[in-house]
Swiss-Prot record:
Protein's name according to its UniProt entry: Diphthine--ammonia ligase
Protein's UniProt keywords contain rRNA-binding: no
Bridged cysteine pairs (disulfide): none
Summary of the function given for this chain in its UniProt record: Amidase that catalyzes the last step of diphthamide biosynthesis using ammonium and ATP. Diphthamide biosynthesis consists in the conversion of an L-histidine residue in the translation elongation factor eEF-2 (eft201 or eft202) to diphthamide. Has a role in meiosis.
Domain of life: Eukaryota
Pathway(s) annotated for this protein in UniProt: Protein modification; peptidyl-diphthamide biosynthesis
Enzyme class: ligase
UniProt subcellular location: Cytoplasm; Nucleus
GO biological process terms held by the UniProt record: meiotic cell cycle; protein histidyl modification to diphthamide; regulation of cytoplasmic translation
Pfam families hit by this protein: Diphthami_syn_2, Ribonuc_L-PSP
Gene from which this protein is expressed: mug71
Keyword Cytoplasm attached: yes
EC id: 6.3.1.14
Classification via InterPro entries: Diphthami_syn_dom, DPH6/MJ0570, Rossmann-like_a/b/a_fold, RutC-like_sf, YjgF/YER057c/UK114
Length: 606
């Protein structure tokens, strides 16, 4: 993609550009926001301003056009999740990038150096979404000790230009990251200082990196101390000098250390399962065939405690002639049902979508996106399965008060986990329950599913789900649902889950559901349910029974809660063989059965 590099002069924005080039992206321009003339630094939650006088030199160093804009706004909207706010400093960024687009209409993405700052990330993502661009944030959630070392070994020469933390003094100003690395790690152990300065402990100025055709040399520097005496920074003058040794950098050059797809824990799971388990050859066993899911004509509705559950929401017969019309009718019916309870689309926590064919995924999303086009939309799982009716879309959702909701909606591409550029959040936490969206084994940095090792894909998808859970600061694990497209993969999924729970010490059942297809032709989709860590007493716990239900197939699972919780209905797609188990989830209180998932045979009433 053609990329605009947002630069502050600091190490993070520059190092992210190195990752962009390593991944094959072409940086076509640079952009920077700076204080008004005569100001060395401003109090901004969003932008690094110290050292801004040197920024014009970066155009010559990169040999790229540089676009700049004065910061005229203030931090008016200080919520973590940003929405358009007049005179906010984020709107300065919007105007800047919009101006760049007029000169570079083929621009596709924006590079940003966000590591831990949700405040910064959500604002860049908001601007990118409004302008039809992607956000590339390859440093997001990276381990800071490793990241600091990666910067040093990659030839990024950055000096400390501001210090504002215990243990850092004016004597450290002007020192390089390489010179400061040991001290920063020592301060991390003593005082929990962020090694990469994510707590505002220090700021840097990049003098050279492999992408620079020329390097920056300081010609004068002056230490400026704040009135408190604990914060000081360098006011510098600089010039550009040639780099006779510089060689042109081609796209996909190895400018940064290789990023392993699997973390240590999941790499161990992968190698353990690979040694113990061989996928069944296609010729050795015939995959199980799916039986179409029977649908009821009326929607399932239950309001209990803090939650409302709506299931079996379909279009109105005779109200549509096209698939788009069916999608609009189904969503209108969902909206009407919500209205009868005094709710709107913003009250929805989680949505389960079943399509008759995954070929309709993009077309459905185009309609769905219009309905849930707001900050932090519901989390979601979407699968395809044959439906025993004329309907091609079935939806179920869990609903509640928005005042109790917090969300994770990361839209920038990174190495962390797949970006959710679609109309759903990675996770929603509400009323003590954390709903994780279904996760598939996409390679997050490129958002592609191009793995030829099915076990690796399954483990990677589980890692994605767990990383989302960690970012949500979840409590105890309640249950796991794994969708598979081939019945022969079920045993492997169970073994992976067993190894995962053994390593983590968590105890939770896994339910494996057979479907016709998953997004991107994935082999598995993991969907996790957690208690919120803020609850003194976990709302839900789980155990597996050996109850067996007989029937030609099973169609629905039903979850029941008492007045403190929810009744949840989501579609289960099973084959002709009956389930050999049921799952029971109970409140920690012995006399209160909070959640009971049961399988209902096709010919039984739900």
């Amino acid at each position: 993609m053609k990329v605009l590099g947002l630069i502050s002069g600091g190490k993070d924005s520059c190092f992210n550009l190195m990752h962009c080039v390593s991944l094959g992206h072409e940086v076509v321009a640079l952009a920077n926001l700076h204080p008004e003339d005569g100001k060395d630094e401003i109090d901004s939650f969003m932008y690094q301003s110290v050292g801004h006088d040197v920024i014009p030199l970066y155009a010559e160093c990169f040999d790229l056009p540089l676009y700049r804009e004065k910061i005229g706004g203030q931090s008016i909207n200080q919520n973590l999740d940003y929405q358009f706010t007049e005179k906010d400093e984020t709107e300065d960024l919007y105007r800047l990038i919009k101006r760049v687009l007029t000169n570079h209409p083929d621009l596709e993405a924006v590079s940003t150096g966000a590591i831990l700052s949700t405040y910064q990330r959500t604002r860049v993502e908001n601007v990118c979404k409004r302008l039809g661009l992607k956000s590339l944030s390859f440093l997001w959630q990276k381990d800071q000790e490793k990241l600091l070392n990666d910067m040093v070994v990659s030839g990024l020469n950055a000096i400390l230009i501001k210090v504002a933390a215990i243990g850092l003094t004016r004597k450290d100003l002007g020192k390089s990251l390489a010179e400061m690395q040991d001290k920063l790690l020592t301060l991390n152990k003593k005082f929990e200082l962020h090694p990469c300065g994510e707590g505002g402990e220090y700021e840097t100025l990049v003098l050279d990196c492999p992408l620079f055709k020329k390097r920056i040399v300081l010609t004068d520097k002056e230490v400026v101390e704040h009135s408190s005496g604990e914060v000081c920074y360098l006011k510098v003058k600089a010039c550009v000098k040639d780099k006779p040794e510089w060689q042109p950098i081609s796209l996909k050059s190895e400018l940064v250390p290789n990023e392993e797809l699997l973390g240590e824990e999941y790499s161990h799971i992968y190698h353990t399962i690979s040694k113990k388990y061989e996928l069944i050859d296609d010729q050795e066993e015939t995959p199980t065939s799916l039986i179409p899911i029977p649908l009821r004509e009326s929607a399932f509705q239950q309001k209990k405690g803090s939650f409302l559950v709506l299931g079996n929401v379909v279009a109105t017969k005779g109200s549509y002639n096209t698939f788009q019309g069916e999608a609009e009718s189904a969503i209108n019916n969902l909206n009407e049902l919500l209205g009868t309870y005094g709710y709107s689309n913003k009250n929805v926590y989680f949505v389960t979508v079943i399509l008759s064919s995954m070929s309709k995924f993009a077309e459905f999303n185009s309609v769905y996106n219009k309905y849930f086009d707001f900050t932090n939309p519901p989390s979601r799982s979407c699968v395809a399965a044959p439906l025993a009716s004329e309907y091609r879309i079935v939806m179920s959702c869990i609903v509640g008060d928005v005042t109790e909701k917090r969300a994770l909606h990361v839209q920038g591409q990174s190495y962390w986990a797949p970006a959710n550029i679609g109309p759903y959040s990675q996770s929603i936490c509400a009323n003590g329950v954390v709903f994780i969206s279904g996760q598939i084994g996409l390679i997050p940095s490129v958002m592609e599913l191009k793995l030829h090792d099915k076990i690796f894909e399954m483990v990677l998808a589980l890692q994605h789900a767990n990383r989302v859970a960690k970012a949500m600061r979840v409590g105890s694990l309640i249950a796991c649902l794994a969708y598979v497209c081939d019945s022969r993969d079920a045993d492997c999924v169970v073994k992976i889950w067993s190894e995962y729970t053994k390593n983590t010490g968590e105890s939770s059942p896994v339910l494996v559901a057979l479907v016709d297809a998953l997004p991107r032709n994935a082999s598995v989709e993991w969907q996790l349910l957690y208690n919120d860590s803020s609850c003194d007493v976990p709302l839900l716990s789980s155990l597996v029974t050996n109850q067996t239900l007989f029937g030609s197939d099973t169609a629905w699972d039903v979850a029941l809660l008492n007045q403190n919780g929810l009744r949840m209905e989501s579609s289960f797609i099973h084959h002709e063989h009956p389930s050999a188990y049921a799952i029971v989830l109970n409140n920690a209180f012995p006399n209160s059965q909070l959640l009971h998932v049961r399988y209902t045979a096709r010919d039984q009433n739900v």
